[in-house]
């Protein structure tokens, strides 16, 4: 029974190893170059920066980006469901409808709370 999950396990192990290698190699070969203050300063096309380059963003930008990611995730679930719609039964159909209903409730809640208003 566990043999059918072997390709998924192998994929996860290989992905983990590649990720760890890609994270570890720069630490092995990088030199400590943070001793120069010029490397830590902001750079704007050869000029001294006019203002602070590390300014804060309004929280609404983060909220809109999170909402975009949530609804982008919805689309990634939507495509496989639409492709396999003729092969799934009513349980698959109503599962997706429940998923869309929960997302719609979340969207309406965010809209009512004023998360999408730019005043």
From Swiss-Prot:
Subunit structure: Complex I is composed of at least 49 different subunits.
Record-listed E.C. numbers: 7.1.1.2
Enzyme class: translocase
Origin species: Arabidopsis thaliana (Mouse-ear cress)
Record's catalysed reaction(s): a ubiquinone + NADH + 5 H(+)(in) = a ubiquinol + NAD(+) + 4 H(+)(out)
The keyword Transmembrane helix belongs to this UniProt entry's keyword annotation: yes
UniProt name for this protein: NADH-ubiquinone oxidoreductase chain 3
Other remarks in the entry: A stretch of 270 kb of the mitochondrial genome is duplicated within the centromere of chromosome 2 resulting in the duplication of the gene. The expression of this duplicated gene (At2g07751) is not demonstrated. It is also probably not RNA edited and therefore differs in all the positions known to be edited.
Keyword tRNA-binding: no
Bilayer-spanning residue ranges: 8-28, 63-83, 88-108
Role noted for this protein: Core subunit of the mitochondrial membrane respiratory chain NADH dehydrogenase (Complex I) that is believed to belong to the minimal assembly required for catalysis. Complex I functions in the transfer of electrons from NADH to the respiratory chain. The immediate electron acceptor for the enzyme is believed to be ubiquinone.
Entry keywords, A to Z: Electron transport, Membrane, Mitochondrion, NAD, Respiratory chain, Translocase, Transmembrane, Transmembrane helix, Transport, Ubiquinone
GO molecular function, one term: NADH dehydrogenase (ubiquinone) activity
Family: Belongs to the complex I subunit 3 family.
Subcellular locations according to the entry: Mitochondrion membrane
